Amino acid sequence: ILEATKNTDGLAAVMGHEIAHAVAKHSVERASRATLVNTSAQLIDIFSGGKLSQVNRTTGMNTVGLITQIGLLNPFNRKQESEADYLGMIFSSLSGYDIRETVKIWERMKELNKGKEPPEFMSTHPSSDNRIRDLNEKMNDVILDYPPIEIS
């Protein structure tokens, strides 16, 4: 991502995003969700007489895990990424950085990853197009609602 970060405003956007993950305790949420999903799958497997394990043996892969990842965990992770994007813009704006650079970063990332991005449903992150759209939709509100903090 540093290749797409061209200046201090861009660096502030990336740092704001990462700080937002910490402030929002996203790693704790992910661990809790993974534990819940794994425990639920084990209980279903036990109460179904091993049917989930049988599916995995029959297909030769962790089909249940893949379905869980795509259907439950990835959408949850994408939501966290979008939340971190939004909070990161707020943190950057409050700190006096130009948050318009956030969109420019994702435009550059889109170009750098051209043809390499997986379909969004298979990714833990929103697509560059969706990120750019969402950031643009929230930009003016963040600029108006979260002006730089004046320290005197």
Feature-to-residue mapping (PLM):
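A Zn2+-metalloprotease active-site environment signal
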Residues: 1-152
